């Protein structure tokens, strides 16, 4: 049995699909199938049921999954400890994104990591807060940018900044708003987000507190789509204040004069990986980029 057999087993269990597992491991589907077959033959156990819905773990597979994950983690720690003696950080990290690269300062992050850890591979994967958190839990991501509260017991998170939010108003609806009254705003059309989005979790309690529901004309979970729909007059939307103000200066929309709660931008990862050298390296770079005290020297929140 080789470590790559265990890595394949864990990846197929997470993805529940041979093709997706092959893509993650940068290999072919036949190679993935061969690894699973060899492992099952050596263990004399059936690890997966092949179903129309994908690869489902058998009871034996479920029992062995946690042990396989721990074994891989231990092997990774061993390798990093050895490389640490050589002052060289090897490996790779998959970081989930939840907004645009400029706001997250990804160019600076990539430049810093490349300068200080040239052997470290970095993957930036586009997503949303609502997708990134479960992806962290199952190991599909190593770390992620998320917005809002992060009270997941398995995760650590560091606040990078508090972002001011604002309600963006299309030109066509501006004259229909006499004052920033929540009940009156709820009667207007809205470009809304899904419940897993941090923007939804920020805005919905304001409507709930006044016993009203907004008219949801369209769903848009991507910020560029939200901005385009508001500019097109589809409805009101919630966006970062800096973006709405820039769009207002460009004559695309208006900022509603109403104070909203701020939204935390966080960097999150599994709590058990707090001392992982790769995670610590990224957190140290973020500390420098965002002008924060060294986040590796204090507890996460």
Q: How should each PLM-predicted stretch be described?
A:
Residues 10-30:
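Short helix-boundary/capping micro-motifs
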Residues 21, 39-40:
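Conserved amphipathic alpha-helical core elements
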Residues 40-62, 79:
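A short LG(V/I)-centered, amphipathic sequence patch enriched
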Residues 90-153, 219:
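Central regulatory/effector-binding core of bacterial HTH transcription factors
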Residues 128-133, 137-141, 146-147, 196, ...:
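Hydrophobic hinge/microswitch elements
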Residues 152-159, 163, 177, 224-274, ...:
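Beta-alpha-beta core module
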Residues 154-190:
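Flexible hinge/capping segments at coil-to-helix
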Residues 175, 189-210, 275-284, 292-298:
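Secondary-structure junction motif
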């Amino acid at each position: 049995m080789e470590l790559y057999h265990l890595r394949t087993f864990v990846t197929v269990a997470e993805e529940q699909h041979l093709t997706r597992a092959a893509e993650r491991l940068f290999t072919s589907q036949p190679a993935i199938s061969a690894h699973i077959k060899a492992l099952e033959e050596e263990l004399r156990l059936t690890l997966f049921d092949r179903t129309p819905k994908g690869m489902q773990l058998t009871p034996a597979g479920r029992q062995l999954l946690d042990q396989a994950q721990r074994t891989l983690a231990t092997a990774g720690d061993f390798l990093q400890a050895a490389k640490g003696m050589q002052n060289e950080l090897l490996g790779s990290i998959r970081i989930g994104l939840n907004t645009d690269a400029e706001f997250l300062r990804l160019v600076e992050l990539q430049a810093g990591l490349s300068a200080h850890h040239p052997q470290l591979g970095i993957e930036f994967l586009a997503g949303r807060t609502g997708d990134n958190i479960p992806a962290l839990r199952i190991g599909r991501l190593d770390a992620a940018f998320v917005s809002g509260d992060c009270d997941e017991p398995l995760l650590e998170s560091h606040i990078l900044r508090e972002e001011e939010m604002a309600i963006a108003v299309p030109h066509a609806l501006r004259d229909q708003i006499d004052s920033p009254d929540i009940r009156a705003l709820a009667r207007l059309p809205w470009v809304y987000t899904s419940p897993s989005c941090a923007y939804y979790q920020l805005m919905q309690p304001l409507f709930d507190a006044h016993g009203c529901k907004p008219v949801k004309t369209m769903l848009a979970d991507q910020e560029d789509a939200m901005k385009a729909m508001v500019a097109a007059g589809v409805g009101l939307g919630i966006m970062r204040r800096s973006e709405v103000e820039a769009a207002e200066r460009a004559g695309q929309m208006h900022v509603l004069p109403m104070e909203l709660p701020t939204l935390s931008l966080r960097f999150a990862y599994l709590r058990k990986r707090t001392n992982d050298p790769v995670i610590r390296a990224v957190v140290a770079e973020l500390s420098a980029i965002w002008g924060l005290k060294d986040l590796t020297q204090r507890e996460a929140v």
